[in-house]
Each structure stands twice: as C-alpha cells, then as structure tokens.
Amino acid sequence: HEDHIGGIPYLYEKIEKDTVIYGGKLTNALIKSKFENFGVKKNLPKMVEVGSRSKISVGKYFTVEFVKVTHSIADSYSLSIKTPAGHVFVTGDFKIDLTPVDNEKVDFVRLSELGEEGVDLMLSDSTNSEVEGFTPSERSVGDAFRQEFQKATGRIVVAVFASHVHRIQQIIDTAAQFKRKIAIDGRSLLKVFEIAPSVGRLNIPKNILIPISAVEQFQDDEVVILCTGTQGEP
C-alpha cells in the first residue's frame, strides 16, 4: 500500500543508483508509477519480479526467500532471511485468509518447513493482535456488499483504499450483478484502475465504467460511485 511504497522515490534519491528493487508484479507496477509521478521516467531502478519461494542473495552472507501471505493487497510476501548469525523471519503485513478473493492462499507448507528449520528472530505485524479470535475472510465482505446493493434504491457510494484491489474487484462484481455503472472519483484510484488490469489483478467487464462527469446522465439506481481519500490518498 501507499504507506509502504510511497517513500521509495525519496529514498532512491539518496542511495546508489545500481540498487535493485524486488517485488511482486503488482507491487513493481505501483512502484514504477510512483517514480513517474515523482518525475522520474528515465534511469529507473532495475525491478525484479518475485513470487512465493523466490530466493535472492544479498552480498556474500545473506539469503532472502519470499513466502506468500494474504493481505489486503495482492502480491504480499513474508521474508525469510538467512544470515551467518541466525535465521530472521519478517512477516510483513498479513491477514490469515483461508478463502481469499483471488484464491492465492498463504503458503502454509513453506511456513511450516521454515518453522521446523528453526527461527531465531521473528519480526511480526501486530495489527489487532490484542483481539481474540480470527479475522473474517474478505469473501464475507462480498456477501455484505450484495445485501446492501439489494436494498439500495438510490446511488451507492463506496469509499475504498485505492490499492485494495480485492475489495475493488468485489465492488465491480457486485455492481455488474446489479447492472449498475461504476464512476471513479480519486486520482490514486484512477491510477490503480489503469495499472491493476494490466498485470492481471483486476477484471473489469466491458462498458461498466463511466466518467464521473457522466453520473448525472444515469438514474440514481443505475450508478455506483467508487471514491478514495483514506490516509491522505489524492
């Protein structure tokens, strides 16, 4: 999300220009867009696409392995870092979702194997760690959307984190089911609608999108307005 990758162009100004960025397909596409917004269109850093169980060597002594986890954005990974001093496991942001919207599940097999090997230090995401129980699956949100769309008689306005592509896909699917057009309001959201389909992370039915300026041309019960603004998104 923006709170993780938004500072990369600023950091890149201060480090060696032969630095390599490793990330998932969507992550790298979003980072490239950040550089373009920053005014850097040439001499971009080398970006290498990784997937679950991809391994890279860092210097002589460090080996980093990417392990698939589920989160509120696609292409999220934990890092298994092997060093001469020990094994460090960095979870990254994660949410254990057994029925994810994109069907790309946590790589429990590899996590179990790494646990059996032994971990000397785990640095873990702690969001909601003080709350007992399990977080509901994202699919349950889709059910809630369908219930609300069924009841709605006027326009529907949905605020969403721009890079939460799973949630956006659920809104698209529900709008299509109820034969509503979608208007997008928010620069960061428009950018995601440009990027995510190009890397296979959004499936948008033909003719479902309309410009925000065209909303008045449709009846209220024919439109969904998708907007952003959370955490300062433009």
Label for each model-derived stretch:
Residues H1-D220, T230-P234:
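His/Asp/Glu-rich metal-coordinating catalytic cores
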Residues E222-V224:
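Loop/turn-to-beta-strand initiation segments
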Residues L226-T228:
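Short beta-strand segments
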